[in-house]
Amino acid sequence: AMGSDRPRFITLEQYAKDVRKLLDLVPHDVDCVAGVARSGLYPASMVAMWLHKPMIIVSQSSGKIVEAGNGWRLGNGHTHVKPSTGKVLVVDDTVMTGGSQAIIRGVVGKQFANVVYATVYCNPAANLGKPDIHAVDLQWPHMLEWNLFNSVISASTAVDFDGILCHDCRPEQDDDGPRYLDFIKNARPLYLPRKEPLPLIVTARIEKYREPTEAWLKRHGVRWKKLIMHPAKSTREREKTDVAAYKAENFERWAKTHTPSPGPVMFIESEHNQAREIARITKRMVVCPATATVWN
């Protein structure tokens, strides 16, 4: 069971369930739903469909409000619903400090007089402004599956390769030969970092596959500072070693010299048992997205 003080990993499945909780809390007398781009568009469109109301999009960066199209079923015949005269429900995914919330209130408040703010998640410690309605309390730090490498923690995150950056190698591809090389070249991306370079990748792939591995990263626009590959000469030789200990050792060496800001330093590992072992050895935060588990 998850302790309340334990950082959470929110999967997309969990997110959908929590959006469902929000649907039960929103007022039905609103004239229009406003989604905050980009993070709030998923819950906002669900709320708009649920309430059968038109939707508009609020851009935090440009301060603009855009119509999202209402579909032919909305509005009475061809009379267009004018959100500006009515009650607006603003929807976003999370409020952590309340800073973004304050900006959005400024943008929306200029154009609409009657506004209700709702988010799926809210940090109980948000000090700059909380929404009027939220479905779930979510403390900091936490990871969102859809925002894994786009958060402020990214700069302090070391990662495993297969099963995180790309889908795992299937057993029949693992021949340490042509099939495996084909897998490395054509692996399907999974969680791709776009915001900033990954400080450290530690992979069980062996050193001789460095060139195609780096080529794959470049092709998918992934930037990284350090890529550590297994020193074994063959995958058979590697199988005799303790891969979790190898990852833990390299993670720890980097973590000791890394200054987290805002922190915490963590490792993202695709395999549950390895993740648990890396956490045990290093006593640091390790996340396994596949099982939505966080060791702290």
How would you name each of these model-derived features?
Residues 92-93, 160-162, 267-272:
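Acidic di-acidic motifs
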